[in-house]
Amino acid sequence: MIYTDETKKALKLCFEAHKNQVDKSGMPYVFHPFHVAEQMTDEATTIVALLHDVVEDTDYTLEDLAAEGFGKDILEAVALMTHEDDVPYLDYVAKLKDNPIARAVKLADLAHNSDLSRIGEVDEETRERLEKYKKAMALLEENSLR
């Protein structure tokens, strides 16, 4: 992971936001954004990787992140990474694909979410979710080939 003052701030906020959450397999949820951040190669993508589920899955808002001093590019990418319940999943993915920060983070997020070693038993619901992730990855990778 890249360690700068800004990434350390995001790391602490991520930990605080997710500290009491667990993932579908019962592991501390915070391991997921930490893993995604480990895949990133620059400060901006590392910060967004750490914060990518904070607004969607916790009580934090974009305004809270702005108050913490995160810049416009970070806030825009986090906003794009935040899936609103009323938006079809692939429409949400299509909206973020033209933002290079959000696209890089989402690809790593999808790869980690598709990792069978962290899923456990693969039932029909999980198969459908994995298929949805596969389509999302194809959509994002299609954009990067232009």
Task: List where the protein language model places each region.
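Active-site helical microenvironments for divalent-metal-assisted chemistry
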Residues: 1-146
